[in-house]
């Protein structure tokens, strides 16, 4: 609607079973090219959250085609991947998901990666936690990091295969972002945004 404070962009062709996010890019970039100028025209001061896939590509496309400021446009990025990471680890370790802090970086989907050195359990490095738990006789299952990253990367495809779409997980994640943007929730998380030299990356 005209004058909106937040615009959530979900427009795009749905991902088919077996289809990669990159295969969606050509069609969905064209859709973004058509709607981005209209959003800029009717809600020029809005904060825009891009959810459509491939989200990182489309966030960049929306920013370029809309002409809006970089601090007005973000994508859902690896937010959902991060939730899947903490969920999987909670199952492997037998502890509450809220006790685990960690992030998934990179592109949303099959090329994402986990910086394991940043994963903690109540502030304790993950490897230190598992070693300490075993010393104390606490059940801390050994887990295969490769299995965890496979779960994180492939969960979306499995959900699409079984249910046809991934509505609820991403919707819940975007609600958290909206609440943070409106000041209703203090949240530190991962999103897609324009880079200018951070981590040695520029104009991405």
Predicted stretch roles:
Residues 4-5:
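An anion/phosphate-binding loop that grips the pyrophosphate of nucleotide cofactors and donors
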Residues 16-17:
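Helix N-cap/beta-alpha junction loops of NAD(P)-dependent oxidoreductase domains
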Residues 66-72, 82-204:
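C-terminal substrate-binding/catalytic lobe of Rossmann-fold NAD(P)-dependent dehydrogenases
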């Amino acid at each position: 609607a005209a004058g909106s404070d937040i615009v959530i962009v979900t427009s795009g062709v749905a991902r088919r079973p077996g289809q990669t996010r990159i295969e969606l890019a050509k069609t969905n970039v064209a859709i973004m090219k058509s709607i981005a100028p209209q959003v800029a025209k009717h809600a020029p001061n809005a904060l825009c959250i891009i959810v459509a896939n491939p989200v990182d590509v489309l966030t960049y496309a929306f920013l370029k085609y809309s002409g809006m400021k970089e601090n007005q446009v973000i994508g859902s990025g690896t937010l959902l991947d991060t939730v899947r990471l903490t969920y999987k680890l909670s199952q492997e370790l037998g502890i509450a998901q809220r006790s685990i802090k960690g992030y998934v970086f990179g592109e949303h989907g099959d090329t994402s990666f986990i910086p394991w050195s940043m994963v903690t359990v109540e502030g304790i490095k993950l490897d230190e936690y598992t070693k300490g738990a075993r010393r104390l006789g606490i059940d801390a299952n050994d887990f295969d990091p490769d299995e965890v990253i496979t779960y994180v990367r492939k969960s979306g495809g499995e959900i699409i295969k079984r249910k046809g779409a991934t509505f609820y997980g991403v919707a819940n994640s975007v609600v958290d972002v909206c609440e943070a943007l409106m000041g209703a929730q203090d949240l530190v998380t991962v999103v897609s945004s324009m880079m200018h030299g951070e981590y040695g990356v520029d104009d991405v």
